Every structure is written in C-alpha cells, then in structure tokens.
From Swiss-Prot:
Residues 44-314 form the Protein kinase domain. Belongs to the protein kinase superfamily. CK1 Ser/Thr protein kinase family. Casein kinase I subfamily. It comes from Danio rerio (Zebrafish). This is Casein kinase I isoform gamma-1. The lineage of its organism: Eukaryota, Metazoa, Chordata, Craniata, Vertebrata. It catalyses: L-seryl-[protein] + ATP = O-phospho-L-seryl-[protein] + ADP + H(+); L-threonyl-[protein] + ATP = O-phospho-L-threonyl-[protein] + ADP + H(+).
Length: 421
C-alpha cells in the first residue's frame, strides 16, 4: 500500500503506553516454541506472508483456541515511521460500527509490534479487475451510498481518513453475513482534525507534504493545503468516477521526476472541468464533485444531501438495493483457491439498508481493526509456509501515485482509456 506520507513530526501525538487488547493480553506477548513456530500473544500462530505495505508485512495467522484464520500485521519496533500503535489507537476511538472489522490483539512480538486482524474479502480494486475494469452505475451507487456513510462515521469520531483508494475498501468474506458490506480499512494515515486538548478544529495550513494517493487525492491536497473533511469526500468522488469511467484523465502521465509527475497530476485535475470528467454520466456525479470542492476547510459537509443525491438517482433508475454487485456470480480467487459468489445470496431490503448505513452515534466501544487481505480460507492449513524473512522499514516520507496493494490477483496493466456506459 504505497502512498505519499506526511512528516513524522506532523503525526498525531502517540501515547507512550502500549494499549492492551482483549483477554489474555497481560500474559506473555509472543513465544517461539522449539519447533520454530512463532506466536503472537497466547493463542495466535503466525503463518505465511499474504501481503505487505509501508507498515511492514501482513501474515496469515490462526487462533489456536477457536481454529479461525486471522491476519497478523507486523511492524518493526524500530520502524523509521511507526504507525501501527497509532492505527490501533484510532480503532479504539472508532469503536464498533458497520464496515469496521475487528481487532483481536495488539502487542509486542519480538522485534515487531503486532496487530491481529479479522480477515476480509477482496478489495474494490481486485473486484474492479475481476469485472474488466468497469463498474455499472448500479454497483457504483451502492458503493457510494455506503462509503459516504463510512466517511461520515469516521468524521463523527473527529478523524479524517486521508487514504482513499480502492485497495482500502474491502467486502466481507464469502459466506459471512457481512460479505456484501463495504468495509473501510487501514487507518495508518488518519489524523485527528479536532484537537483532543482544545476541542477545536485544527488550523488551516499550507505547504504541507502530500499525504494520500495522488490518483484520488483532492486538488487542495496537491496544492499543499492541510486536509480536512472535504478532502476525504472529494477523493471519494474521484474514485467513483474511476469506477464508472475505467480510468481517470490524469493517469499514466509521464515526467522525469516524481515531483514533476505529481505536479502534472494536480495540474491535470485542476484543468479538467467537472463536466468533462463526468460527461455521459448522470448529473448527480458532477453535482457531488462541485459540492465537495466548494466546501470550506472548516465546514461540516452535508452528508445527508450527498447520500440523497445518489439514493434518489438510484430510485429513479428503478434499481433494487439487493447487493447484486457486478462481481456477483464470478469466481473470486482467494489464497487457497476460488470462491463462487452466488447470485442468489441473501438480499437485504432497502429499508434495512437505509437504517444500517446511517452512522450510529451510540455504538458501544469495542476494539476494531481492518485487514488488507483478500479472500477467504478453507479447512486446509496454509500456516506451514511460515516465513521468517525480515521486514524492511519504509521511508519516512514516501510519495507514490500508483495505487498499489497486496492482493491475490495477478494484475494486468491496461491502457488508460476511459470506458463509458
């Protein structure tokens, strides 16, 4: 998961006290038996590598008490830009809500900090590839309605996300009751926009380093302006158009240096009229982008207005909110094979969806986390492929345009030609 990173000094203040997870966390945090089996906490066995990113590595794990597979996120204790502890703290802040999977454990594991995560299904980027890199309007609207609510909930907890990209939104595992829900993952770049001490909005600043993924980030982020709630929503709008078009006009730009490339991306975004970007698609897509780009730095977005833009369009088109996404009925690769997504999967009524996708302000606090793994696992135990390869810490500040992720698909690079429905 490569993305531009802000300077460490600009990160929210980290607590020096390592938070404890669930039951049993006061016991030894890690162990290595004579057989060479690596353990995290008292009951999580570490297996093969299934992903990687700026934080370090993602490993397959198994809860030896319940026999359930999990994901284990490992970050070197001596990382140049540590984020795992901060991410864990943000998940405690977020608590329990729809589309926020669980964290089962956080603590030291030898030379690493470890967070044990819930396994989820494939990312929207994986599914986009599976669907020949274009989504129907119905699928995009079902995604958009959910993600506006996800972002509203995150913002309600005084956090901004700052890492919008398709790789960071995952469906649930097949066969799970949450398999049709779009989950938001990876809060390593999140930031408190309300100062926890003063309870005031962070000040407007300029000359900030880029944070996020250049393909989707807001125009103001390219200009070096401090991010706020408006920027998360603008980045979502760019992602929605990416799904509808198949690509964005600022993809594939060439330059001699990374700095020049990001400058070109930002310039192209500014110079591409919204009407051109959204040409041949419903006016609501352009209305959404115009609204979020006009928001003031301190302004609270009208999430209901944005949601209603898309729900009214959805109704006008005569769609049913049955979670029949474009990928339903296709074979979805997993770490151990393929899973057929049943087109007759349990449908949820529009009314229940509408109720569920409104963020709850009274959710009980519960440790949560996300997994950037994709797919599900069967009864075969792949943990024997455990690797002790060292983790290389990433640079403190990294700027990368291409939305990279660790997935179970072999990506095919395609020409960036817009696709229209």
């Amino acid at each position: 998961m490569d993305h531009p990173r802000e300077k460490e000094a600009d990160r929210p203040v980290r607590s020096s006290k390592v938070p404890q997870g669930r039951s049993g966390h006061s016991r030894p945090s890690s162990s290595s038996a004579s057989s060479g089996v690596l353990m995290v906490g008292p009951n999580f066995r570490v297996g093969k590598k299934i992903g990687c990113g700026n934080f370090g590595e993602l490993k397959l794990g198994k809860n030896l008490y319940t026999n359930e597979y999990v994901a284990i996120k490992l970050e070197p204790v001596k990382s140049r830009a540590p984020q795992l502890h901060l991410e864990y703290r943000f998940y405690k802040t977020l608590g329990s809500a729809d589309g926020l999977p669980q964290v089962f454990y956080f603590g030291p594991c030898g030379k690493y900090n470890a967070m044990v995560l819930e396994l989820l299904g494939p990312s929207l980027e994986d599914l986009f590839d599976l669907c020949d890199r274009t989504f129907s309007l119905k699928t995009v609207l079902m995604i958009a309605i959910q993600l506006i609510s996800r972002m509203e909930y995150v913002h309600s907890k005084n956090l901004i996300y700052r890492d919008v990209k398709p790789e960071n939104f995952l469906i649930g595992r097949q066969g799970n009751k949450k398999e049709h829900i779009i989950h938001i993952i990876d809060f390593g770049l999140a930031k408190e926009y309300i100062d926890p001490e003063t309870k005031k909005h962070i000040p407007y600043r300029e000359h900030k380093s880029l944070t996020g993924t250049a393909r989707y980030m807001s125009i103001n982020t390219h200009l070096g302006k401090e991010q706020s709630r408006r920027d998360d929503l603008e980045a979502l709008g760019h992602m929605f158009m990416y799904f509808l078009r198949g690509s964005l006009p600022w993809q594939g730009l060439k330059a001699d240096t990374l700095k020049e490339r990001y400058q070109k991306i930002g310039d192209t975004k500014r110079n591409t009229p919204i009407e051109v970007l959204c040409e041949n698609f419903p006016e609501e897509m352009a209305t959404y982008l115009r609204y979020v780009r006009r928001l003031d730095f301190f302004e609270k977005p009208d999430y209901d207005y944005l949601r209603n833009l898309f729900t009214e369009l959805f109704d006008r088109k005569g769609y049913a909110f049955d979670y029949s996404y474009d990928w339903v009925g296709r074979q979805i690769p997993t770490p151990v094979g393929t899973v057929h997504v049943d087109s007759g999967a349990s449908a949820i009524t529009r009314e229940s969806h509408a109720h569920r996708d409104r963020p709850s302000q009274h959710q009980p606090l519960r440790n949560q986390v996300v997994s950037s793994t994709n797919g599900e696992l069967n009864a075969d135990d792949p943990l024997a492929a455990h690797s002790n390869a060292p983790i290389t810490a990433q640079a403190e500040v990294e700027v990368v345009d291409e939305a990279k992720c660790c997935c179970f698909f072999k990506r095919k690079r395609k020409k960036n030609t817009p696709r229209h429905k």
